[in-house]
Amino acid sequence: MAYGWNGCGMGVQVNGSNGAIGLSSKYSRNTELRRVEDNDIYRLAKILDENSCWRKLMSIIPKGMDVQACSGAGCLNFPAEIKKGFKYTAQDVFQIDEAANRLPPDQSKSQMMIDEWKTSGKLNERPTVGVLLQLLVQAELFSAADFVALDFLNESTPARPVDGPGALISLELLEEEMEVDNEGLSLKYQSSTATLGADAQGSVGLNLDNFEKDIVRRDKSVPQPSGNTPPIAPPRRQQRSTTNSNFATLTGTGTTSTTIPNVPNLTILNPSEQIQEPVLQPRPMNIPDLSILISNSGDLRATVSDNPSNRTSSTDPPNIPRITLLIDNSGDVNSRPNHAPAKASTATTSTASSNNLPMISALNISKGSRETLRPESRSSSSSLSKDDDDDNDGEEDGEEEYPDAFLPNLSNSEQQSSNNDSSLTTVTGTSGDNSFELTNDSSSTSNDDYACNIPDLSELQQ
């Protein structure tokens, strides 16, 4: 028997039978796997890649097997061959997995396993197509076994078990025809159609009335009105009066809210204003009413003197200072430096009414009073001593007149600075007149600066 390079020949048994194989087969059972074309190996590897079937095939390959004696159909005695052990272990399977991870994703692990197996071992140990087919049947990989039998060897598919996972599953469609019983569509199920007339007999419509509508009359307990009397509408509750009253209430509150502007109410500081102004007058938006700050202090003092027993009543807010006491006549303040006896006569009344409040009106000094003080400071040294004594007397009177005032006397500071400058003439050796003129010029300038920085509180009385 002559074999070609691909192992093709005549007289090869197929599944134990003496059947002849035509020239159409590619390979024989004795053809080594390293002689099979790469395209066929690739197609076989694609089948073994499903569900990692190559692992199962690699785990059952016997060690030291004589492939020339086991290549024939039914010549492989698997239990006797595995006594020598298996060719590959789990470590070898793990190495193939690690090698496949370093390769491109399209690389087949089954193809790597076949490439390693077909080139390993000696001449009689390298696998053949016949050994591959028998090992696939032993591993119950019947899809790959059918591919090798049909495409490689042109043989019939190997026998499969009757039951189990390897049993043959028929994928042929049923060709039986089902008979339809049309007797059930007889006219006995359409009793009402015959009563529709001759026109309904030739109708082919699907929306036909095939039912017997028997209306069941039921006696209802609700009394039915007679046909002559018209129906009477049920009485309804009239809510118009309540609605109108609610609407009027809402309207009244709406108008009240619109008339009252968003202005802070400062009348609580002065209870007399609440009596004098019972009705709120419309004021500009966001402008506080400062008129309560400018009120007649004489009215308040008269009210306090007339009602000494009602000082703790609920009309006067507790712990609220009377701001109107701060606003006095600026003309009286201007006349204080020139009329000392008048100050002494009014000291007791102002002290009683001050109530530990600073006399801010003392700052409101007109320019005329300041100018009258300047010629006195520019007089000779003899007149300065006299003015000094007068000012000291004025200081004592001022302290008695304003015991609670903590404001500095600008005239005293001006004259004290002039005295200090005149005393410096004895140290520097300069004339007293020259140094006094320079000092008075500087002091007058400083007084002008103080006059500019003093706010004019008389504007609150406008």
Curated annotation (Swiss-Prot):
Show me the sequence repeat boundaries.
262-269, 286-293, 319-326, 356-363, 453-460
PTM = Phosphorylated by pll.
Q: What processes does the entry annotate via GO biological process terms?
A: apoptotic process; determination of dorsal/ventral asymmetry; dorsal/ventral pattern formation; hemocyte proliferation; innate immune response; larval somatic muscle development; lipopolysaccharide-mediated signaling pathway; positive regulation of antifungal peptide production
Listed GO CC annotations: cytoplasm; cytoplasmic side of plasma membrane; cytosol; nucleus; plasma membrane
Q: Which Gene3D superfamilies match?
A: Death Domain, Fas (1.10.533.10)
Please state every residue range assigned to the domain named Death.
27-152
Q: Where in the cell is it found?
A: Cytoplasm; Cell membrane
Q: According to the UniProt record, where is the region Disordered?
A: 218-265, 301-462
Q: What's the domain of life for this entry?
A: Eukaryota
Q: Where is the composition biased (Polar residues)?
A: 301-317, 355-367, 425-438
The record describes the protein's role as:
Plays an essential role in the Tl receptor signaling pathway that establishes embryonic dorsoventral polarity; the signal directs import of dl into ventral and ventrolateral nuclei, thereby establishing dorsoventral polarity. Tub recruits pll to the plasma membrane and protein-protein interaction activates pll. Also has a role in pupal pattern formation.
Would you tell me the protein name for this molecule?
A: Protein Tube
Organism expressing this protein natively: Drosophila melanogaster
Gene name tied to this protein: tub
